[in-house]
Structure formats: structure tokens, C-alpha cells
């Protein structure tokens, strides 16, 4: 009887030890509703059992979420830190500007770059002021008052045979208001003056203007068949500023004196 009781006690103890092992078994759903039993580990998929946690899919999902959350926290912390540094730097700049404006209020402020009154002198005008008040053009070229008017002229006459006669020397004319008429001389005499009345009708005037321009206009009385002769006049006259030299009457044109070499030197090609 004693052995029977001892045998029953050992079986109960062995059954108590095997009970946790039976509880470790896990019934997993299989393919086509055919469950299978995992002796150790966890259900992994439809046919096998997983012993370690890194073999489970939700393990990696959990770690991925944790890493992303940590990155977001670090990014927000860095942005907050940079914003605080920028605010502190701006506060220091404002303090420096305030002290410079208070202590540098003399005629020569120490913080000239921060003084708005000093910088306002370099401020350009407003756009509306520039539009409504455009800049005026420069004044025209005029002769100084009280200065005598002088004119130097040169007459070049070219014939149809491409040969030019002799050039002659002349003197300057003091003014046009006197309208003095010189006696006519022949072309062969040196130093003789030629008046506009003795100028051939078939000619054209070339006048140098104040802006270094050249006005060339044929005379209205010139004919088409006659050889064209050219008279170059450089004069600074107030009457010639607004008119063409060909539109003036013969009285207002200054006296023209030919200049050049004597006839003994021969023709100039």
C-alpha cells in the first residue's frame, strides 16, 4: 500500500511538471483551415514556428516607428534651438543700435552706419518727383556777350574736268551787322576778297554747327546742268542757329574770303 501511494505521488508530481510544457504549446492556423501545433516558439506564417522576436514582422514595424519618432523630435529640437539663437542675436543688435543712437548724437556720430539722419542724405529722390520734374536739356551753344564775331571761310571750286584752280588767302571778318561790301576783285589776284554777291549761283554751303555737326544744303538758284561749286563756311552766328545757310538772304551771309595757295604752285589734284 505504501508503494502504491508513493507511486501515485510521483505521477502527480510528474504531471505537475509536464503541465507547463503542455501550456507552452500553441495551436496555429494553417493552410486550408488545417491548424498545426508549435511545440516551442510562436506562430510564424502559415506553416512554421518562430523562436526569436526578430523573426516576427511586427518587431521591425515597432522599431521603424520608434526611429521615425526620434528623428522628428531631434529635428524640432534643433529648429527651436536655432530660433532662440537668432532671437538672442537680434536682441544684441538692437541693444547695440540703441546705445549707438544715444551716445553718438553729435555732429560726427560714432555709429554713422546706424544713424538714419546721416544715411538720409544719400537717399535718392522719389519716383514721382523724378517723373513730374524731368531734367531740362543743356542750353544751346551761344557766343559770349560783348565778344566780336569772327568768321573764317575757305572756298573750294571744282570744275567738271576734276581740276581745281588756285586758292587765295584772305582776311577775317569782324561782324555781320555792319554789312560792309568789299569791292569785287578778280580771282587771279592774291589777297582779294569775294563777296556773296560774286559767289557763283551754282554752289552749296557747308556750315559747322556747335555740336560738331555739318549741314550741307545746295543753293536754291543752282541749276542741274551747271557744275556744282562748294563753299565751306565755319561761323558762329546767332542768326545762323535757327536757319539753314541756304535759306538766308544774301545780305545776312558773312563775307567769304578764299584761302589757299597761290596760282603759281599749280593745280591740286
Swiss-Prot record:
One Pfam family here: WBP-1
Domain notes: The PPxY motif 2 mediates interaction with WWOX. Both PPxY motifs mediate interaction with NEDD4.
Sorted UniProt keywords: Repeat
Molecular functions (GO terms): WW domain binding
Coiled-coil intervals: none
Biased composition, class Polar residues, residue ranges: 174-183
Keyword field contains Membrane: no
Protein name: WW domain-binding protein 1
Domain of life: Eukaryota
Motif (PPxY motif 2): 137-141
Effect of residue 141 to A: Abolishes interaction with WWOX
Lineage: Eukaryota, Metazoa, Chordata, Craniata, Vertebrata
Gene behind the chain: WBP1
Tissue: Expressed in most tissues but at significantly lower levels in placenta, lung, liver, and kidney.
Motif residue range(s): PPxY motif 1: 124-127
Quaternary structure and interacting proteins, as annotated: Interacts with NEDD4. Binds to the WW domain of YAP1, WWP1 and WWP2. Interacts with WWOX.
Region (Disordered) location: 169-203, 249-269
Amino acid at each position: 500500500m505504501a508503494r502504491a501511494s508513493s507511486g501515485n505521488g510521483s505521477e502527480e508530481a510528474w504531471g505537475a511538471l509536464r503541465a507547463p510544457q503542455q501550456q507552452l504549446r500553441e495551436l496555429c492556423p494553417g493552410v486550408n483551415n488545417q491548424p498545426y501545433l508549435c511545440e516551442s516558439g510562436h506562430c510564424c506564417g502559415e506553416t512554421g514556428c518562430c523562436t526569436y522576436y526578430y523573426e516576427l514582422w511586427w518587431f521591425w514595424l515597432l522599431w521603424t516607428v520608434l526611429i521615425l519618432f526620434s528623428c522628428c523630435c531631434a529635428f524640432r529640437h534643433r529648429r527651436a534651438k536655432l530660433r532662440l539663437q537668432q532671437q538672442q542675436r537680434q536682441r544684441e543688435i538692437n541693444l547695440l543700435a540703441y546705445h549707438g543712437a544715444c551716445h553718438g548724437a553729435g555732429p560726427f556720430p560714432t555709429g554713422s552706419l546706424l544713424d538714419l539722419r546721416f544715411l538720409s542724405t544719400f537717399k535718392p529722390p522719389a519716383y514721382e518727383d523724378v517723373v513730374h520734374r524731368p531734367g531740362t536739356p543743356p542750353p544751346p551753344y551761344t557766343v559770349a556777350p560783348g565778344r566780336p564775331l569772327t568768321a573764317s571761310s575757305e572756298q573750294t571750286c571744282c570744275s567738271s574736268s576734276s581740276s581745281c584752280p588756285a586758292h587765295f588767302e584772305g582776311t577775317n571778318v569782324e561782324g555781320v551787322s555792319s554789312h560792309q561790301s568789299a569791292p569785287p576783285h578778280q580771282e587771279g589776284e592774291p589777297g582779294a576778297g569775294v563777296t556773296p554777291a560774286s559767289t557763283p549761283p551754282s554752289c552749296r554751303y557747308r556750315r559747322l554747327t556747335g555740336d560738331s555737326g555739318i549741314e550741307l544744303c545746295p543753293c536754291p538758284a543752282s541749276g542741274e546742268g551747271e557744275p556744282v561749286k562748294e563753299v565751306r563756311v565755319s561761323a558762329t552766328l546767332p542768326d545762323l542757329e535757327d536757319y539753314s545757310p541756304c535759306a538766308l538772304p544774301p545780305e545776312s551771309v558773312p563775307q567769304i574770303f578764299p584761302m589757299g595757295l597761290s596760282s603759281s604752285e599749280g593745280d591740286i589734284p
